[in-house]
Amino acid sequence: MKQDFEIKLYEVVDHQKSADGTEKFLFRLQDGNLIESVLMRHNYGTSICVTSEVGCNMGCAFCASGMKKKLRNLSAGEMVLQLESVYEVIKEKISHIVVMGIGEPFDNYQNVINFLHIVNEPHGLEIGSRHISVSTCGLVPMIYEYAKEDLQSNLAISLHAPNNEIRDQIMPINKAYRIEELVKAISDYIIATNRRVTIEYILIDGLNDSIKCANELADLLHGLNVYINLIPYNEVKEKPFKRSKKEQMRKFYDTLKKRSMNVTCLLYTSPSPRDTERYRM
């Protein structure tokens, strides 16, 4: 692998370990820019959350990554080097990859696609496509492009709101692609690929966590082959948003279950390979 790309592994600027086995790596790139990669350990294996850009232009109001404007795309080789550099430290088999780190993967589309092919090929890392997930905040045209790719990797949508009014407040991309367009793209993707889509929904206190919002979300996604992942908000000191209270998260979760939605929240259910709560940086 190394001889196909840059030979020198990244310098580890910072390495933090959490009690749950999660490890965060701050790497210095060849040009001096810094990126993060996150290692998660699960009962089904070890996964790496890969960064696709230096900075991010999506500007999601709740996200720490969006505070740093995008400087450039990462190449496929630079994404592979994140895996190699993490492996050099942990010396453990990497079983799953999630492209959900800093940056919008579909804003660096071709490099991300090249990366997915590299890690999946027999002479690469040989990670099965179904053990790879890519997350987007909703670049609708690229969802249609992704559906055409010769890939079996998973798609996750960062939705975080059940309607345009709330999504407009926290996700600028919604001004370009309304929630109705996004849901149609999700539906068309499912039909084209026969694959389930993960819906990521961060629960923010007083903003998108009401019972009304839960019912709106169920109405919005009714009949679609989706898996809703409720994510307790990871508070950012520079942001005004707060994590939903546990009892409110429970009510939101229970409302969706009563509406027969396929839903999980790691506060209440056992993690599976499709869970993405711990993948969010």
Predicted features along the sequence, with ranges:
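Conserved alpha-helical substructure of the radical SAM core
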Residues: 67-96
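Conserved small/polar residues in nucleotide/adenosyl-binding loops
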Residues: 268-275
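Hydrophobic alpha-helical segments, chiefly the membrane-spanning helices
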Residues: 279-281
